[in-house]
Amino acid sequence: FAVLVLFSTVVQAQSLDKLFRKYADDERFEYTSIGKGMLGFASIFADYSILTEGQMEKITGFKMLKLEKDSAYQELAEKFMNDIDAIIEKGDFETSLVKREKDRRIYVYKRVDKRANADMLLLSKSNTGINFVWLKGKTSDEEMDRIQFEKERQAKEEDIL
């Protein structure tokens, strides 16, 4: 069973990697990737648990894709959103935040495996473009306990129904 859980976590992370590789070299996208070394250096100046509101204690990877909306890119924007939606749906992500403004939508999704490895996705859609950010790292012990408690509570509710 543990091997199956580990395998599914690896496959899900590969799906995110595959999505970023797919669009990273496309000239119509702005792509940013910050590796573990640079993030380690940045941690000297910033507390990641504060920046992520306690959800991530350590960030080991940061990737961002940005697509400016243009009528010529409408089909590409739809395909990009379909790819993102598929990853979120298949990846067992929990919705942490949904914010709707007049001309913009912001979504934050997260998932944590049994070893406290965490992925946080930030998606911003507006009339002018799409921004998709992937933060990879470790969650805090407190957040891990909260997630475990929430999963147990949901399982009990499902048993009652």
Region spans (language model):
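Contiguous interface-forming segments/domains that mediate binding rather than catalysis
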Residues: 21, 88-92, 146-152
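C-terminal partner/receptor-binding element of secreted or periplasmic proteins
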Residues: 12, 137-161
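Mid-length scaffold segments of soluble, non-membrane domains
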Residues: 65-104
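Bacterial Sec-dependent N-terminal signal peptides
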Residues: 1-19
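Early exported N-terminus immediately downstream of N-terminal targeting peptides
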Residues: 16-81
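Localized chelating/binding microdomains
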Residues: 43-45, 60-69, 117-118, 132-133, ...
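Extracytoplasmic
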Residues: 26-29, 57-62, 90, 101-103, ...
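A short, solvent-exposed beta-edge/loop patch
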Residues: 109-140
